[in-house]
């Protein structure tokens, strides 16, 4: 199923998902440094593997995907399938509602 078929996202629920499943490796704060994973500020509309100052896998650099609702929805289902060779160890979010919530949060928090 595509993002177009996803349930409406709830940013508050997405923030909880981010804090429990993403924040150990990522931040969304403008100007903050990278953690284990890259800072996600400015994520929407950015090409994969291009955040300055972060050492990406060749897989992320070569994928050249532009991050948006549709690409994130597919990526977050199964990151290692979407970008084979990615360094991201997160197994993904199988529930469409959780992916929609996280994307709704990221859209607000990374702008």
Curated annotation (Swiss-Prot):
Q: Which GO terms describe its cellular component?
A: mitochondrial intermembrane space
Indicate where the modification N6,N6,N6-trimethyllysine is found in the sequence. Answer: 80, 94
Record bears the keyword Ribonucleoprotein? no
Provide the leader sequence positions: none
Entry-annotated residues carrying N-acetylalanine: 1
Q: How is it modified after translation?
A: Binds 1 heme c group covalently per subunit.
One biological process term from GO is: mitochondrial electron transport, ubiquinol to cytochrome c
What keywords are assigned to this protein?
A: Acetylation, Electron transport, Heme, Iron, Metal-binding, Methylation, Mitochondrion, Respiratory chain, Transport
Q: By its UniProt entry, which InterPro entries does this protein fall under?
A: Cyt_c-like_dom, Cyt_c-like_dom_sf, Cyt_c_1A/1B
Where mainly found?
mitochondrion
Q: Which domain of life is it from?
A: Eukaryota
Similarity comment: Belongs to the cytochrome c family.
The function of this protein is: Electron carrier protein. The oxidized form of the cytochrome c heme group can accept an electron from the heme group of the cytochrome c1 subunit of cytochrome reductase. Cytochrome c then transfers this electron to the cytochrome oxidase complex, the final protein carrier in the mitochondrial electron-transport chain.
The entry's protein name is Cytochrome c
Q: What broad taxonomic lineage does this protein's source fall under?
A: Eukaryota, Viridiplantae, Streptophyta, Embryophyta, Tracheophyta
């Amino acid at each position: 199923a595509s993002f177009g078929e996803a349930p409406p996202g709830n940013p508050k629920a997405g923030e909880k998902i981010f804090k429990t499943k993403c924040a150990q490796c990522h931040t969304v704060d403008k100007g903050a440094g990278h953690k284990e994973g890259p800072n996600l500020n400015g994520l929407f509309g950015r090409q994969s593997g291009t955040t300055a100052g972060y050492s990406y896998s060749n897989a992320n650099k070569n994928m050249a995907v532009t991050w948006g609702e549709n690409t994130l929805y597919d990526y977050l289902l199964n990151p290692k399938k979407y970008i084979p060779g990615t360094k991201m160890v997160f197994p993904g979010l199988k529930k469409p509602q959780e992916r929609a919530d996280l994307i709704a949060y990221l859209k607000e928090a990374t702008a």
